């Protein structure tokens, strides 16, 4: 059963400006620990791709907060949702702290997709009720 759907789109240039204005602290505020490692690696290899990664993760967090219907307030916090990639490239969510407990208690799971193209980043999240007794 679908609980909620959320979408977010943003101009990468605006995120770049905020990143520059905060001297990089924006990434520390937004990204979870595993996302931060990926971001730092990508940023070191290619600055533009690193910022695109940050933008897609920002969009995923915004879309997720809309899908669960609570906005950006507890149990949702910037760093408590991580969007990581499986070896195949498929994006998957992981939860930290209070959000992990919230998702487990509700028996919800999130399905996420992210994309970026030159100046825009987008994410869509669908939150569903897990079927009891299912591993999926």
Curated annotation (Swiss-Prot):
Q: Which domain of life is it from?
A: Bacteria
Q: Is Magnesium given among the entry's keywords? A: yes
**One Pfam family it belongs to:** ACPS
One of the entry's Gene Ontology molecular-function terms is: holo-[acyl-carrier-protein] synthase activity
**Do the record's keywords include Lipid biosynthesis?**
yes
- Catalyzed reaction equations: apo-[ACP] + CoA = holo-[ACP] + adenosine 3',5'-bisphosphate + H(+)
GO cellular-component term (any) = cytoplasm
Entry keywords, A to Z: Cytoplasm, Fatty acid biosynthesis, Fatty acid metabolism, Lipid biosynthesis, Lipid metabolism, Magnesium, Metal-binding, Transferase
Main localisation, per the record?
Answer: cytoplasm
Residue numbers binding Mg(2+): 8, 62
The biological process GO terms on file are:
fatty acid biosynthetic process
The EC number(s) attached to this protein equal 2.7.8.7
Question: Per the UniProt entry, what species is this protein from, by scientific name?
Answer: Polynucleobacter necessarius subsp. necessarius (strain STIR1)
Q: Which Gene3D superfamilies match?
A: 4'-phosphopantetheinyl transferase domain
The record describes the protein's role as: Transfers the 4'-phosphopantetheine moiety from coenzyme A to a Ser of acyl-carrier-protein.
Task: Name the needed cofactors.
Answer: Mg(2+)
Q: The organism's lineage? A: Bacteria, Pseudomonadati, Pseudomonadota, Betaproteobacteria, Burkholderiales
**What protein name does the entry list?**
Holo-[acyl-carrier-protein] synthase
**Where in the cell does this protein reside?**
Cytoplasm
Q: Give the family, as the similarity comment puts it.
A: Belongs to the P-Pant transferase superfamily. AcpS family.
